């Protein structure tokens, strides 16, 4: 069987490696950290994964946490009313039901187990901070080298695809805060998504971390704005305090839940900024050898739509299918480009939807979001975009399709189509 080396031990790299091992391939995974170092390190993402992504884990028998991880069954959206409405006034707030539950497992829990599973299933693990000479070594010794490490020197080998990349600078200042003691919300567990126009976003959801069930606070501030003060934060305690300040100031309806929470651990914080980018899928090493990029290496989106780990799982599944279909043929440039093209046929929709969510919402989107507080089918369909982003293009992304869909839903409910006026006039604090 072909020998395949995967450089990078995250969601995509390990999922692909385990999938290949199940079909008898000779697999080596290169990780820059041992399982124990990952367990005891800092958090790396928020990774709320939806059913269509989790299905790939279930198919490989590697979803070990469903029984322990809190299940996410809803996505709720709250938008405050603009001035001159008093602070804390809500324009609209509603919750959409997922058709199947989602879950978030801290990668400090998941990746060590998967890395150990690589060896348990007959693969090899190399602990090395791989650089270009290391890639040359692996390329000389392997039939295919896949780069799944989304940062650092080797990710820089993959040229930016200007035609597919919308942004050239960060669109949000990002911060994650893993906490215990967040008060329970009313109703089913879910993602609470708060959109503060002109300022940023705050979303929070239940998860499983190294110390058990927790909540993850995700804060996304417009760069240079009032939610972008992380450069002055110098300790985990200050990080928690700044997270609370932002919540109390900009999402006061969430303050009662958050005011008494504490960090899960000192490693449960993360900040950063990056420019979303799409890169060329194939890199040429100095020797002329070719390597194939995977997941975040080739398509890196802002986390506003929570698609990072979901994209990684789906990219790994697509690459697995392509490799299996290729058999013993040479893994040449044509194979690599066709494999990425197959993934991009899906990921292009995710990228376009995510890019749209980063901008000011157009009138038809505001109309839909407002109407979702009156029509549950709209709220439910919006929630399930996170599981199936291409569906957004059938109703959410296009003004004409949005208008037709709204009329259809209103007609089925026996009412006239509602605009944003009635929804946006609702006031009071969100529960």
Feature map (PLM): residue ranges:
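Beta1/beta-strand and adjacent pyrophosphate-binding region of the FAD-binding site
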Residues: 1-12
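Glycine-rich FAD pyrophosphate-binding loop
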Residues: 7-9, 18-42
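N-terminal FAD cofactor-binding segment of flavoenzymes
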Residues: 33, 37-83
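Conserved N-terminal helical subregion
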Residues: 63-145, 149-159
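Central beta-strand plus flanking loop segment that forms part of the substrate or channel wall
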Residues: 158-193
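Conserved FAD/dinucleotide-binding core of flavoprotein oxidoreductases
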Residues: 196-269
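FAD-binding beta-loop-beta segment adjacent to the flavin cofactor pocket
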Residues: 271-294, 299, 303
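C-terminal helical "tail/cap" subdomain of flavin- and related membrane-associated enzymes
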Residues: 305-306, 321-431
């Amino acid at each position: 069987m072909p020998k395949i080396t995967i450089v990078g031990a995250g969601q995509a790299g390990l999922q692909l490696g385990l999938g290949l091992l199940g079909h008898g391939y000779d697999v080596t995974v290169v990780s820059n950290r041992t399982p124990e170092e990952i367990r005891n390190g800092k958090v790396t993402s928020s990774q709320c994964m939806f059913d269509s992504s989790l299905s790939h884990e279930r198919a490989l028998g590697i979803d070990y946490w469903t029984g322990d991880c809190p299940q996410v069954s809803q996505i709720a959206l709250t938008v405050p009313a603009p001035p001159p409405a008093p602070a804390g006034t809500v324009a609209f707030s509603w919750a959409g039901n997922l058709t199947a539950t989602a879950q978030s497992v801290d990668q400090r829990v998941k990746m060590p187990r998967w890395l150990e599973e690589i060896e348990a299933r007959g693969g090899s693990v190399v602990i090395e901070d791989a650089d270009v000479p290391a890639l040359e070594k692996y390329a000389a010794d392997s039939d295919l080298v896949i780069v799944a490490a989304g940062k650092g020197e080797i990710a820089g080998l993959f040229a930016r695809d200007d035609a597919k990349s919308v942004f050239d600078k960060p669109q949000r200042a990002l911060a994650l805060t893993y906490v215990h003691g967040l008060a329970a919300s009313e109703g089913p567990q879910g993602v609470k998504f708060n959109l503060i126009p002109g300022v940023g976003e705050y979303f929070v959801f239940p998860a499983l971390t190294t110390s058990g069930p927790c909540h993850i606070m995700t804060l996304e501030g417009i760069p240079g704005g009032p939610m972008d003060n992380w450069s002055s934060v110098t300790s985990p305690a200050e990080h928690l305090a700044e997270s609370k300040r932002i919540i109390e100031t900009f999402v006061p309806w969430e303050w009662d839940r958050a005011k008494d929470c504490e960090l899960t651990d000192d490693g449960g914080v993360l900040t950063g900024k990056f420019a979303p980018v799409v890169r060329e899928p194939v890199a040429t090493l100095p020797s002329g050898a070719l390597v194939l990029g995977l997941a975040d290496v080739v398509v890196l989106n802002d986390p506003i739509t929570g698609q990072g780990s979901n994209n990684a799982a789906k990219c790994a599944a697509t690459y697995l299918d392509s490799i299996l279909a290729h058999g013993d043929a040479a893994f040449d440039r044509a194979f690599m480009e066709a494999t990425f093209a197959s993934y991009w046929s899906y990921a292009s929709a995710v990228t376009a939807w995510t890019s749209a969510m980063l901008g000011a919402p157009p009138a038809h989107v505001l109309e839909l979001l407002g109407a979702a507080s009156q029509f549950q089918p709209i709220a439910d369909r919006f929630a399930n975009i996170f599981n199936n982003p291409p569906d957004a293009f059938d109703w959410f992304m296009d003004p004409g399709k949005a208008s037709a869909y709204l009329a259809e839903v209103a007609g089925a409910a026996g009412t006239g189509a509602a605009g944003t006026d009635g929804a946006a006039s609702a006031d009071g604090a969100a529960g």
